[in-house]
């Protein structure tokens, strides 16, 4: 079999000159994924970094060469160029299911589509588990590795960098924490049942359109919660048949979970009750950005401008009620236009489309209520992803245009000739003794500050040659200039404070906010900001309001300056990263990942110590002080949780944990008692 696979790979070798690379569309476990053209058809080209181990490349190629299924991404060929390896794979124009569900723009979809995606994912996994002679385990099933094609109607599994042969009982941890089965990160031996657990979390995600454990950033905290039996909250009014299947698949004991073949059979029966999965979803996935427009011109999903209304939406407005085949097609998604130009005109119609039925329950009730039979567009949620990720969703057109306006304005200001800096120097000032200088004027100071008149305090280089005036002037002019700038700045600051205090004391004085030394520069810069950040117009004839308005304008100017500096710093950083050697870049990224894992372990350890101390105090025992471990003594990120915490009299350490094998609900999480092998 290995020889046959090697021969197939040799036959599938592609000359790199036949490939025309286009924009990057994402990244996988070991490399970048680019859109490309090969033999007059669109393909996805996965580039493996030079530092990637050859065995990882060979593993993915070997596994893909064995796979041929409509719900699994196909491998067309392999190529190499400049010490980099490229895999030519099937292109999924719809992007990942994760971006579809949780991206900036959230296209609408029906319950029929959700059930169809879950069924197709189950069929692809069942195919892997049933392969001969060596079945395969994916080990990293999550929406990021599920791609949409055919306008959202078809789903395909990708990223086989974690696939393993089922013939070997695997013990190394792979996958993401929120979708990872407890036996995987626990360190126990696991089988294909870990994919079934991950599939159940994906099913919950497409039903709720929420990210599991979204509010928890620490991966080890998520693993600890899953180990203790916590699961995502059950969906109210969810069909019992779907709920029973979902809860059976995420059971703690792997042997209690059904097989993927059984899941496929159940899903085939479920999808019969929901028609409409063959309806195309009108959206386009371009450069990690989803663009949705209906044929009648209405936008099928709310853009970023509705993010401010997020607090007004309750779970009731974002969930669905199962429908029968008779009425599943009746409730089509229709959302009014929400473009920037028509936002004001359509406020009433838009509000009527998204008004929740139980407003205000988002923060008070942990459960998600499903009271509508369709997916409405959901405003963008607050993202936890790093803004330094070069594969994040691109900025909106308005933000890009605003940034270009700022840059162009700064360039014009930099090119504008500035007034020449001049110094008025007393003719015989440097020839006078200190006593003569002090007696020359009753108002003169000993430092000679009154002898200098600075007409401009901007940091402009002094280029005027004053050597012809006096031999000592040229030597001391730079120092005098710097002191003069400092004095002038302090005087201006004191004068401005005194002036503002006088205005506050006399409320009858009108202050014109535009009468400032910036000649309207701050006003024009403030108008570049987003509407929610722009200064509110002041109250007429109110001195305090005028001062607040002026302060806001100053802060807006500072904000734009800082934001622009951040942009240039990020651009400079990106250029340095591109110029950096790939091996060095990978080493630095690996170091950053290890540092983050170290911080996560330290945080988890401190949390467990606090819980242990609280339990000891509650039981009337005085906890023994434990020396704080050295960071290097912390457990490896992939090791299972410390057993001296896990086996504390059979009870959980988290508040509200379950003892004695009973089930309870704590803070909206379904708690399942952990399983301990005899």
UniProtKB/Swiss-Prot annotation:
Catalyzed chemical reaction(s): L-seryl-[protein] + ATP = O-phospho-L-seryl-[protein] + ADP + H(+); L-threonyl-[protein] + ATP = O-phospho-L-threonyl-[protein] + ADP + H(+)
Enzyme class: transferase
Pfam families given in the database record: PK_Tyr_Ser-Thr
Domain Protein kinase: 19-271
Active site: 140 (proton acceptor)
Domain of life: Eukaryota
Gene Ontology MF annotations: ATP binding; JUN kinase kinase kinase activity; MAP kinase kinase kinase activity; metal ion binding; protein serine kinase activity; protein serine/threonine kinase activity; ubiquitin protein ligase binding
Record keyword Heme present: no
Cofactor annotation: Mg(2+)
Gene3D superfamilies: Phosphorylase Kinase, domain 1, Transferase(Phosphotransferase) domain 1
Keyword tags: ATP-binding, Immunity, Innate immunity, Kinase, Magnesium, Metal-binding, Nucleotide-binding, Serine/threonine-protein kinase, Transferase
Keyword field contains Cell membrane: no
Ranges of biased composition (kind: Polar residues): 353-364
Residues involved in ATP binding: 25-33, 46
Annotated region described as Disordered, given as residue ranges: 296-322, 339-365, 431-455, 616-647
CC annotations in GO: cytoplasm; cytosol
EC numbers on record: 2.7.11.25
Biased composition (Low complexity): 313-322, 339-352
Free-text function comment from the UniProt entry: Component of a protein kinase signal transduction cascade. Mediator of TGF-beta signal transduction. Responsible for activation of the JNK MAPK pathway (basket, bsk and hemipterous, hep) in response to LPS. Component of the NF-kappa-B pathway; relish-mediated JNK inhibition involves proteasomal degradation of Tak1; certain targets of Relish that are induced during immune responses may facilitate destruction of Tak1 and switch off the JNK cascade. Participates in diverse roles such as control of cell shape and regulation of apoptosis.
Entry similarity comment: Belongs to the protein kinase superfamily. STE Ser/Thr protein kinase family. MAP kinase kinase kinase subfamily.
Protein name in UniProt: Mitogen-activated protein kinase kinase kinase 7
Species in which this protein is naturally found: Drosophila melanogaster
Lineage: Eukaryota, Metazoa, Ecdysozoa, Arthropoda, Hexapoda
Gene: Tak1
């Amino acid at each position: 079999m290995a020889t046959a696979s090697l021969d197939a790979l040799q036959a599938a070798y592609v000359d790199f000159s036949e490939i025309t690379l286009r924009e990057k569309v994402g990244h996988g476990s070991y490399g970048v994924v680019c859109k490309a053209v090969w033999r007059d058809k669109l393909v996805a080209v996965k580039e493996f970094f030079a530092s990637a181990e050859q065995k990882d490349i060979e593993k993915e190629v070997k596994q893909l060469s064995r796979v041929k299924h409509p719900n699994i991404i196909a491998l067309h060929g392999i190529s190499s160029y400049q010490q980099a390896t490229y895999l030519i794979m099937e292109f999924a124009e719809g992007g990942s299911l994760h971006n579809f569900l949780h991206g900036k723009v959230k296209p609408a979809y029906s319950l029929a589509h959700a059930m169809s995606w879950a069924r197709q994912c189950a069929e692809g996994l069942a195919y892997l588990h049933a392969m001969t002679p060596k079945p395969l385990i994916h080990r990293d099933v999550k929406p990021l590795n599920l791609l949409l094609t055919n306008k959202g109607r078809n789903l395909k599994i990708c990223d086989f960098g974690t696939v393993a042969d089922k013939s070997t009982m695997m013990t190394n941890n792979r996958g993401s924490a929120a979708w990872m089965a407890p036996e995987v990160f626990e360190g126990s031996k696991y089988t294909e049942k870990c994919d079934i657990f991950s599939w159940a979390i994906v099913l919950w995600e497409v039903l709720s359109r929420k990210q599991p454990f979204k509010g928890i950033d620490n991966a080890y905290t998520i693993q600890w919660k899953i180990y203790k039996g916590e699961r995502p909250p059950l969906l109210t009014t969810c069909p019992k048949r779907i709920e029973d299947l979902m809860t059976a698949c995420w059971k703690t004991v792997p042997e209690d979970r059904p097989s993927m073949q059984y899941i496929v059979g159940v899903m085939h029966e479920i999808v019969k009750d929901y028609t409409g999965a063959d309806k195309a979803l009108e959206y386009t996935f371009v450069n990690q950005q989803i663009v949705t427009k209906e044929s009648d011109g209405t936008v099928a999903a709310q853009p970023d401008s509705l993010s401010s209304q997020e607090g007004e939406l309750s779970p009731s407005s974002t969930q669905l009620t199962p429908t029968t085949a008779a009425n599943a097609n009746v409730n089509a998604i229709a959302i009014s236009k929400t473009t920037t130009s028509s936002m004001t005109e359509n406020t009433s119609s838009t509000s009527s489309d998204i008004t929740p039925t139980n407003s205000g329950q988002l923060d008070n009730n942990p459960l998600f209520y499903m009271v509508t039979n369709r997916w409405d567009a959901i405003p963008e949620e607050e993202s936890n992803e790093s803004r330094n990720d070069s594969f994040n969703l691109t900025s909106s057109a308005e933000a890009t245009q605003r940034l270009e306006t700022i840059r162009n304005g700064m360039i014009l200001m930099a090119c504008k000739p500035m007034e020449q800096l001049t110094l008025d120097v007393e003719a015989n000032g440097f020839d006078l003794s200190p006593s003569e200088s002090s007696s020359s004027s009753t108002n003169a100071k000993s430092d000679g500050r009154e002898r200098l008149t600075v007409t401009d305090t901007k940091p402009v280089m002094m280029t005027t040659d004053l050597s012809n005036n006096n031999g000592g002037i040229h030597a001391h002019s730079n120092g005098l200039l710097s002191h003069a700038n400092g004095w002038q700045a302090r005087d201006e600051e004191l004068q401005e404070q005194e002036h503002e205090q006088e205005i506050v004391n006399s409320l009858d004085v009108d202050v014109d906010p535009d009468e400032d030394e910036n000649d309207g520069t701050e006003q024009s810069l403030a108008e570049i900001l987003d509407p929610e950040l722009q200064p509110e117009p002041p109250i007429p004839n109110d001195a305090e309001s005028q001062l607040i308005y002026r302060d806001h304008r100053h802060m807006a100017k500072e904000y734009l300056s800082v934001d622009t500096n951040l942009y240039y710093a990020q651009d400079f950083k990106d250029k340095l990263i591109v110029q950096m050697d790939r091996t060095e870049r990978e080493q630095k990224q690996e170091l950053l990942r290890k540092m983050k894992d170290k911080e996560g372990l330290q945080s988890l350890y401190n949390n467990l110590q606090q819980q242990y101390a609280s339990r000891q105090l509650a039981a009337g025992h005085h906890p023994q002080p434990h020396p704080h471990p050295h960071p290097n003594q912390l457990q490896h990120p992939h090791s299972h949780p410390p057993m001296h915490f896990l086996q504390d009299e059979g009870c959980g350490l988290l508040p509200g944990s379950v003892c004695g094998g009973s089930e309870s609900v704590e803070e909206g999480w379904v708690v399942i008692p952990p399983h301990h092998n005899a």
